[in-house]
A protein has these predicted regions:
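Canonical Rossmann dinucleotide-binding motif of NAD(H)/NADP(H)-dependent dehydrogenases/reductases
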Residues: 3-39
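Short C-terminal tail/terminal secondary-structure segment
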Residues: 243-269
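Conserved glycine-rich Rossmann-like NAD(P)H-binding loop of the short-chain dehydrogenase/reductase
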Residues: 33-51
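C-terminal helical subdomain
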Residues: 123, 189, 207-242, 247-251
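Conserved mid-core segment of classical short-chain dehydrogenase/reductases
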Residues: 57, 63-74, 78-83, 89-117, ...
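Catalytic loop of short-chain dehydrogenase/reductase
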Residues: 15-25, 95-182, 191-196, 220, ...
């Protein structure tokens, strides 16, 4: 169902790789709700993915940018300003861990890889906002979002150093969000259920954990489409006074100590 919630709004969406990507679903829903946007991802990710198909579907321009590069980000935002003038929303859906990819245990992580993942997954969010801030390119009541996961606050062993990255990401949203208030721009993170994406599927034991989260969540896991709908709401004018928050979109998992389904399994029922 479409409501025209984003009619006339312009933005930048980072991180769409393929149809499994949450950012891909967000782009589709933003388009359906009337928004125009630029799609961006790192050059290597664009070669691996299918972003051009999404661009064609949504009538969007694709601009390659390494979100860890201030030079690339500067060029991207200059292009957005030339195309749209000031913009209304930004989605940061970027994350990676070389330690996870290489199967390094948390007690034996490679610190060079740690730094790389930290830069890509968290510091890039600060760099994106710093670039937008310096170019003064956000309209009043604009909205900036990043996607995160509850492992930022609770221990999930196989999530490895991505948990640390997400924790820092959430802190950046609060810290920079305070200053963005001066410009009447809101900054939030959405803590999503475990979701089948290219990045998420690389975590050891991911399938089992998804089933566990489903059993633990009163409403079940939130899908990528559910997350996209939440992003649309957060980009819309209906949420103007929501800022500096970590918003759980997880079917109630974050506030459930134990569910009856899980208890029954341990009781053999």
């Amino acid at each position: 169902m479409m409501y025209g919630l984003l009619k006339g709004k312009k933005g930048i969406i980072f991180g769409a790789l393929n149809e499994q990507s949450i950012a891909w679903k967000v782009a589709e829903r933003c388009h359906e709700e009337g928004a125009e946007f630029i799609l961006s991802n790192a050059p290597i990710a664009m070669r691996m993915g299918e972003i051009n198909a999404l661009a064609e579907k949504t009538g969007s321009e694709v601009i390659a940018a390494d979100a860890t590069s201030m030079e690339d980000l500067g060029k991207l935002f200059d292009a957005a300003i030339a195309k749209f003038g000031k913009i209304d929303f930004i989605l940061h859906s970027i994350g990676m861990s070389v330690n996870v990819r290489k199967g390094k245990h948390y007690t034996d992580i490679n610190y060079d890889w740690l730094e790389k993942g930290w830069d890509v997954s968290a510091v890039s969010f600060h760099k994106v906002m710093k670039t937008a801030w310096e170019k003064d390119c956000m309209n009043e009541w604009g909205s900036i979002l990043a996607l995160t996961y509850i492992a930022a606050q609770r221990t999930f062993p196989d999530y490895n150093d991505m948990a640390d990255n997400k924790s820092y990401l959430e802190s950046i949203a609060r810290s920079f969000g305070y200053y963005w208030g001066e410009k009447k721009v809101r900054v939030n993170t959405i803590s999503q259920s475990p979701t089948v994406t290219t990045a998420g599927s690389g975590v050891k034991g991911f399938g089992g954990f998804m089933r566990f989260a489903e059993d633990m969540s009163p409403l079940g896991n939130a899908t990528a489409l559910d997350c996209a709908n939440y992003c649309v709401a957060m980009f819309s004018d209906l949420t103007r006074k929501v800022t500096m928050q970590n918003l759980f979109n997880d079917g109630g998992f974050s506030n459930t100590g134990v569910s009856q389904k899980v208890v029954d399994k341990y009781n053999g029922e």
